[in-house]
From Swiss-Prot:
It holds the Pfam family RecO_C. Involved in DNA repair and RecF pathway recombination. GO terms for biological process: DNA recombination; double-strand break repair. The keyword DNA repair applies. Belongs to the RecO family. One of its GO terms (cellular component) is bacterial nucleoid. This is DNA repair protein RecO.
């Protein structure tokens, strides 16, 4: 066992361990994924208290162990309490946290992903349901970008030709390939599914509005817009389009992860059919 060490980390997952401990999955900015024992953290008199709660950022002092390292001391840096004001913002945060947990690994620092995730959680605080959805989708796009698997929106992944999107919604459709990692022109000999995943490649159709939104989110200027300016510009796209693009990204993520995500179905219950039909 080595010396104690210090790191900044955010709690992504917690589970009971033994009679009184918790096992935390912590995303450390400079160490990647850490599995840490939070000793005696399940008791009412725990000195760690709320420091082991979900999405709390702590300055941690850690003692290396033979199998698992142990938290000696934790000083809270951020808590994101505004996530708990409504179900949609909390669900969006849990959605992002689940995806991030799949992207991180022990001893592999990802400071850009850490900063992006924390910034997105901060933007979600106090957001309306519609705003939370837009922030979530932008957050997912950033995670995909930092993971090196961002979809291609501006050119056909098969031919390399640039995509010209109509300014108004028509019967125009574009294909989206999960295996190919982006959009493609639909051919008569290449049938594409609509809402459901079709074929081994997981292809589906996108409308002009969905492609325009994907292209807008892929722009570097959009990725780093301040929260209020981003939400103002996001109003140009109907709620139904945001919901549709979220499902595309969800399926795309699940295709690459080769397993279903647990949290996203909870997001569906946050939006009633009546709300989805409104712009």
């Amino acid at each position: 066992m080595g010396r104690t060490y210090r790191t900044i980390g955010i709690n992504l997952k917690a589970m009971p361990l033994g009679e009184s401990d918790r096992l935390l999955s912590v995303f450390s900015r400079d160490r990647g994924l850490l599995k840490l024992v939070a000793p005696h953290s399940r008791g009412s008199r725990s000195r760690l208290g709320g420091r082991v709660d979900l999405f709390v950022v702590n300055d941690l002092f850690i003692s290396p162990g033979r199998n698992l390292d142990r938290i000696l001391q934790a000083e809270t840096v951020a808590t994101y309490q505004g996530l708990h004001h409504q179900l949609t913002t909390l669900t969006a945060a849990q959605y992002l946290g689940e995806v991030v947990l799949y992207q991180i690994h022990p001893q592999q620092p990802q400071p850009e992903l850490f900063d992006w995730f924390c910034a997105t959680l901060d933007q979600l605080q106090g957001a309306s349901s519609r705003a939370a959805l837009a922030i979530l989708v932008r957050g997912l796009c950033g995670i995909l970008r930092l993971g090196g698997i961002a979809p291609e929106w501006y050119q056909c992944h098969e031919s390399g030709c640039k995509i010209a999107v109509p300014t108004a919604d028509t019967d125009w459709r574009l294909g989206f390939s999960f295996a190919g990692g982006g959009v493609f022109r639909i051919r008569a000999d290449h049938p594409v599914g609509n809402e459901s995943v079709a074929g081994a490649g997981g292809d589906r159709q996108l409308t002009a509005s969905e492609v325009r939104l994907g292209q807008w989110l892929a722009m570097p200027t959009t990725q780093f817009l301040a929260r209020d300016e981003f939400l103002t510009q996001a109003e140009a796209y109907p709620l139904s389009v945001w919901l549709s693009l979220e499902r595309v990204l969800r399926q795309y993520l699940q295709f690459h992860l080769e397993q279903p995500l647990r949290v996203p179905p909870l997001l569906d219950s946050c939006f009633s059919p009546v709300a989805v039909s409104q712009p």
